[in-house]
Amino acid sequence: MNASEKFIAAKAHVDEAAVAPLPNSRKIHVEGSRPDIRVPMREISQADTPASMGAEPNPPIFVYDCSGPYTDPTAKIDIRSGLVALRQQWIEERGDTEVLADLSSEFGRSRAADKALDELRFPGLHRHPRRAKAGMNVSQMHYARRGLITPEMEYVAIRENMNRAAYVESLRTAGPTGEKMAKLLTRQHPGQSFGASIPEEITPEFVRSEVARGRAIIPNNINHPESEPMIIGRNFLVKINANIGNSALGSSISEEVDKMTWAIRWGGDTVMDLSTGKNIHETREWIIRNSPVPIGTVPIYQALEKVDGKAEELTWEIFRDTLIEQAEQGVDYFTIHAGVLLRYVPMTANRMTGIVSRGGSIMAKWCLAHHKESFLYTHFEDICDIMKAYDVAFSLGDGLRPGSIYDANDDAQLGELKTLGELTDIAWKHDVQTIIEGPGHVPMHLIKENMDLQLEHCKEAPFYTLGPLTTDIAPGYDHITSGIGAAQIGWYGTAMLCYVTPKEHLGLPNKQDVKEGIITYKLAAHAADLAKGHPGAQIRDNALSKARFEFRWEDQFNLGLDPDKAKEFHDETLPKDSAKVAHFCSMCGPHFCSMKITQDVRDFAAKEGLKEDEALAKGMEVKAVEFVKSGAEVYRQV
């Protein structure tokens, strides 16, 4: 749908491209200790090794799956109804929440009463919000610190292990060479974890202990029961976030829901709705009700819309109402720029690009207009009270992040980081889950300093970075400039990477841009997991490499992050089905394929009863004799 077309709720439908299963993949569920803990994963099937190479079976591998029910052919998807409330029973049985008779937010009530919005409204708005009972704290951190292992924690533990034990067992029982295959395909380089403590197997107790310490969060608002629990922390798989959202210049509710379903199809672990245009409240409701992943927002954006874009007119009362409005819709984490202090603003005067964070610039303007600290800072404990009543996590915003390589690691950025560490202590006093946002634009040699200082000042609270971009010279390719920095800082310990699309600095991303950003950042996150030595991270690489060596082209495509593009590139030059079993590609052709030559050496060794190194030596002798007999000319006329 184009932005100019009218969105009508009754006609809303899911994007068909987002619900089709990926090639040779199917949704499976691993059951936990109770029947309603069913953890989704994607199973990728593989063909057997060709008879000429041993004819051994290649069991399916299992990969992390963020797509919710959208890629499950057995699920009935109707975005007008929203997703099933997966966690509803878990929330209710804890007995510490109550269903409200009406919305608590004044703005929320006014939108609900506006009949002119009926055609836009999500049909399920009869849903009543939920809040903690008086004096109760419903955060996962609070439960963890009381020693409780929640169903969410067990769910996360199963999810992080990615059914690795079942895969290893399937290798061992695959045939006479099973033990050898298991050893070969689970081999992994040790990695360098820079102090992370990653166990061989993730247990529910380990999840609980990490959440209790503040080293990980499970962003699960009690008003977003549709979400599938996931975890963000340096001792877990590196996660990625996708930003979506409309602006005053374009996009519609339909397009933003499509972007969300598209982002999670390709691997977005969380989605941030950064809408600044029309109907922000209604757009967010549609996204949350249809999202199986946590949704984040920057509440100050909507608060600013309520005062017609005049930052100096913002008040604590308007912001508080916005927090409650969004918490009761089900937002799982809020970016709040409470670390932008009055004394830091002059430090940005000599920057090349000043304050580039929208939230940071809004609060800097407010501080200067009132010549005092922002209400985000002075009311921080009041904000904590709201967060723990709904289990909304803090994403403490880096409002003074560098917007250019020139400004990297300056006093303003690092001063704010120290303040974010102090605010983390306050949030933890209230048992509110917290992550810390980071830069930005940073050259490669300064990236590790960012990670080290964050660990020091913020006491290992999860780091969440935008890239960082490692150079400023490539508009249109900033998914690559930032992907370089993302892989690096993910290796050093960043828990979640915020994607950057090719449109960064240039315009609002469309669906294809979202996919490009997601794939780039899934690659960066996976590279970081490999470098850290995360258990099982190399399984997919090993499986794909084996498929490549055995010329199982379809398996190569399907084991990759983007099967569609891999197949498209291959078929540009070799489109026929016969090319899918050929022992070469268009890069080297049939006579110069290094992998085919290696296989020929192995076949020769087996035929002659030789070891591979002996076969190479003997083969060279034979070729030398042929060379001399042919006239010993380096070049021959043909």
Curated annotation (Swiss-Prot):
One of its GO terms (molecular function) is zinc ion binding. The keyword Oxidoreductase does not apply. One of its GO terms (biological process) is thiamine diphosphate biosynthetic process. Binds 1 [4Fe-4S] cluster per subunit. The cluster is coordinated with 3 cysteines and an exchangeable S-adenosyl-L-methionine. Its EC number is 4.1.99.17. Keywords: 4Fe-4S, Iron, Iron-sulfur, Lyase, Metal-binding, S-adenosyl-L-methionine, Thiamine biosynthesis, Zinc. GO terms for cellular component: cytosol. It holds the Pfam family ThiC_Rad_SAM. Its cofactor is [4Fe-4S] cluster. InterPro entries: ThiC (IPR037509), ThiC-associated_dom (IPR025747), ThiC/Bza_core_dom (IPR038521), ThiC/BzaA/B (IPR002817). Substrate binds at N243, M272, Y301, H337, S357, R358, G359, D398, G399, L400, R401, E437, Y464. Signal peptide: none annotated. [4Fe-4S] cluster binds at C585, C588, C593. Disulfide bonds: none annotated. Coiled coil: none annotated. It catalyses: 5-amino-1-(5-phospho-beta-D-ribosyl)imidazole + S-adenosyl-L-methionine = 4-amino-2-methyl-5-(phosphooxymethyl)pyrimidine + CO + 5'-deoxyadenosine + formate + L-methionine + 3 H(+). Pathway: Cofactor biosynthesis; thiamine diphosphate biosynthesis. The keyword Transcription does not apply. Homodimer. Catalyzes the synthesis of the hydroxymethylpyrimidine phosphate (HMP-P) moiety of thiamine from aminoimidazole ribotide (AIR) in a radical S-adenosyl-L-methionine (SAM)-dependent reaction. Belongs to the ThiC family. This is Phosphomethylpyrimidine synthase. It comes from Aromatoleum aromaticum (strain DSM 19018 / LMG 30748 / EbN1). The gene is thiC.
